[in-house]
Amino acid sequence: MINRNANRDRDRSRSNDKELKINYRIKAREVRVIFENGTQEVLSIEDAIKKAKEAGLDLVEVSPNVSPPVCKIIDYGKYKFHQEKRQKEQKKNQKVIKLKEVRMQPKIDAHDLDFKSKNILGFLKDGNKVKVTIRFRGRELAHTYLGYGILNSILEKVGDVNYVLESAAKMEGKTMFLIVAPKFKK
């Protein structure tokens, strides 16, 4: 007989492993208890839970891998709320940098080059890295110097923005590229 709920049960057990054990879910016989004022004491699990209940708080296992496990007497709901708030704050402060790519050919017109360099300028101001790619086809491969000239003119046009040349112009197969990144203030 096939157990159709096996995957669901396995997934539930995984999600419970990430959560902290509180009160009667703690399996150890003895625990090191850290009280609200910072003092520590090794107690039996029953005594520790009793002290937590007297204080109107929860016994939360914070470090299960040591012997005896370390537990804190705290308000679990408040603790979990502050943990989630801290994680959201860290996620909000995290800066995600994307790599944008601008493609062109060596036979690009001056107006098109201006338009592409304005796009590159916008990407850099938004805080994204930019990969400028020039694809050579057929006989154009004999004139790679045109690609270097185009890339240099783009760098001159983007010069008024603080940027770092992360990867200088180089050929790879039939394409020439360079990577430009914005300079961040520390």
From Swiss-Prot:
GO molecular function: ribosome binding; translation initiation factor activity
GO cellular component: cytosol; membrane
Localization per record: Cytoplasm
GO biological process: ribosome disassembly
Keywords noted in UniProt: Cytoplasm, Initiation factor, Protein biosynthesis
Superkingdom assignment: Bacteria
Protein family per UniProt: Belongs to the IF-3 family.
Subunit-structure text: Monomer.
Function, as annotated: IF-3 binds to the 30S ribosomal subunit and shifts the equilibrium between 70S ribosomes and their 50S and 30S subunits in favor of the free subunits, thus enhancing the availability of 30S subunits on which protein synthesis initiation begins.
Protein's name in the database: Translation initiation factor IF-3
